[in-house]
């Protein structure tokens, strides 16, 4: 095998583990304050979940040509918003479906993350641990999630991964762009990620700042690339997020990766190029759980 061919396979195909973590990992700084299970009554349906620490409601919406799914998530503590790695391993070309990773971590709700494994650079901080501190040199900002549940976008060139952790950041996402900032749409009507099509399956997460200090998130996943649902533009997703009152919203990996999982089921219809309804394997997820 030629050296160039092997190099390409190593980057894009051959799995290579760097670090393994246990499932359901909690940041050491928050472990003592986080309940490991619900201690009260659990009430759930196909579209709702409620216990003494969290309340989740899933609704379905439709534009003229696209179906989307909205998760309204209220938590008693930001500790219940977590991330997980495929096969609980950080490395290259290590993937699994969103639903499989969610099940392995006992997630109540989950979405695909930023697919860190598709890139060789870009900060990777998951549950308070730095896995990668290489600047991705992108025009887009990253999203930082702090231990109190608040969101803040930042440029990697302006800081280091360790400084972020030292300031209270527990998770970062290196995809983008920022959709809503300070309650205002932050993308133009024609903006797109790279050479992607304008209408796409999308995954986005936003935060609503509540006056009582509670943690409130909005997550939206749209179907796309099918005759039944064409998909959303970044601007359309940003407008949707704004309509729910978020102060900050961020675009995560989309296309065939876009998946919403809830109460043991995949809620949306993940698809790749409209060929078949199936989940794409990804490197990481965002989830709600104990």
Outline where the language-model segments fall:
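Short, glycine-/Ser/Thr-/acidic-enriched flexible segments
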Residues: 63, 76-78, 116, 158, ...
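Active-site-adjacent helix-turn-beta-strand microarchitecture at beta-sheet edges
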Residues: 116-198
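Conserved hydrophobic/aromatic beta-strand scaffold that supports enzyme active sites
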Residues: 68-72, 178, 204, 285
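A short, polar/proline- and glycine-enriched secondary-structure boundary/capping micro-motif
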Residues: 92-94, 162-168, 198, 228-233
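Zymogen propeptides
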Residues: 1-136, 141-142, 152-153
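Conserved, well-ordered active-site substructure
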Residues: 120-137, 190-211, 216-247, 257-290
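Short, solvent-exposed aromatic-acidic interface loops
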Residues: 86-90, 157-161, 221-226
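Structural recognition of the beta-strand scaffold that forms the well-ordered cores
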Residues: 108-112, 142-145, 152, 206, ...
């Amino acid at each position: 095998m030629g050296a160039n061919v092997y190099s390409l396979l190593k980057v894009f195909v051959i799995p290579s583990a760097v670090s393994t973590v246990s499932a359901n990992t909690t940041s050491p700084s928050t472990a003592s304050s986080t309940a490991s299970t619900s201690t009260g009554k659990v009430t759930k349906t196909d579209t709702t979940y409620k216990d003494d620490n969290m309340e989740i409601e899933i609704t379905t919406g439709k534009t003229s040509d696209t179906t989307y799914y909205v998760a309204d998530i209220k938590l008693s503590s930001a500790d219940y918003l977590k991330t997980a790695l495929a096969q609980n391993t950080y490395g290259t070309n290590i993937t699994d479906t969103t639903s499989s990773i969610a099940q392995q971590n006992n997630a109540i709700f989950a979405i695909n993350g930023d697919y860190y494994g598709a890139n060789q650079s870009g900060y990777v901080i998951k549950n308070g641990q730095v896995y990668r501190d290489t600047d991705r040199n992108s025009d887009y900002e990253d999203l930082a999630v702090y231990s109190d549940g608040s969101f803040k976008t930042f440029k990697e060139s302006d800081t280091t991964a360790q400084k972020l952790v030292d300031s209270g950041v527990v998770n970062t996402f290196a995809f983008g762009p920022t959709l809503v900032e300070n309650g205002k749409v932050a993308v133009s009507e024609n903006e797109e990620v790279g050479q992607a099509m304008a209408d796409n399956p999308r995954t986005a997460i936003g935060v609503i700042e509540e006056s009582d200090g509670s943690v409130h998130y909005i997550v939206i996943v749209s179907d796309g690339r099918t005759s039944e649902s064409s998909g959303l533009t970044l601007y359309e997703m940003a407008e949707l997020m704004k309509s729910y009152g978020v102060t900050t919203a961020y675009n995560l990996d989309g296309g065939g990766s876009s998946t919403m999982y809830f109460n043991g089921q995949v809620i949306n219809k993940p698809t790749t190029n409209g060929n078949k309804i199936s989940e794409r394997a990804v490197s990481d997820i965002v989830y709600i759980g104990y």
